[in-house]
A protein has these predicted regions:
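Conserved lysine of the Walker
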Residues: 45
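Conserved P-loop NTPase
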Residues: 165-200
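Residues in well-ordered beta-strands of folded domains
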Residues: 1, 83, 185-186
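Generic low-polarity alpha-helical segments
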Residues: 1-4, 105, 190
Length: 200
């Protein structure tokens, strides 16, 4: 291909090919890529997310957004845990979160119209996000998140292709879990490069 990739992207592709997941994810965390975990209840995605959180530099200001407390951050002293309930939505929490000057925002699950707000946060100075979504496989994740984003007031006024391309260029890595094993790993910097330039 004629796509110029950075050395670290080649290193990640090599690590992925060799199933060297520790190297792959350490680079992904260091480069502040946005990572999405996929899988059903009990699939292992929360346990894996905790392992990724431990890889984040400990002086990072973390904001976690959850409905029930799952993500402990014992090594990150500069953190805030925010919770959404029926009367306080994830969308409202994301808006409030911006005032807390986070380095990284960890949203445990994308479920509804907050998806667009979270994508916007990742694209406006807060990269390195970790989140999860329910989808059938790794390749369908971008489409699922785009569907959720279209439920927002902003999303309703935008073309679907624009939203989908925003998702494809924002979510860098997708990990699909099935019965506590990671069965799929998506990372395609070539596709991202082409989408950013309108060539896909």
């Amino acid at each position: 291909h004629d796509v110029p990739l950075a050395d670290w992207q080649y290193q990640m592709l090599a690590a992925k090919a060799n199933r060297d997941l520790n190297t792959f994810f350490q680079i992904a965390i260091d480069r502040k890529l946005n990572i999405c975990m996929v899988g059903g209840t009990g699939s292992g995605k929360t346990t894996f997310t905790k392992a990724l959180v431990d890889m984040i530099p400990h002086d990072t200001r973390l904001i976690t957004i959850e409905d029930t407390h799952e993500l402990d951050t014992p090594h990150h002293l500069n953190h805030a845990h925010l919770f959404y309930k029926e009367h306080i939505t994830a969308k409202q929490i994301i808006a409030a979160c911006m005032r807390l000057k986070p380095d990284r925002i960890l949203l445990t699950e994308l479920r509804g119209d907050e998806a667009w707000d979270y994508l916007s946060a990742l694209n406006t100075g807060h990269p390195g996000g970790l989140t999860s979504v329910h989808a059938n496989d790794a390749r369908s994740v971008h489409y699922r998140i785009a569907q959720l984003a279209m439920e927002s007031a902003a999303g309703k006024s935008m073309p679907y292709d624009y939203i989908l391309n925003t998702v494809r260029t924002t979510i860098d890595v997708v990990c699909f879990f099935n019965r506590t094993y990671m069965t799929e790993l998506y990372f395609d910097p070539v596709e991202k490069y082409l989408v950013l330039r309108g060539r896909v």
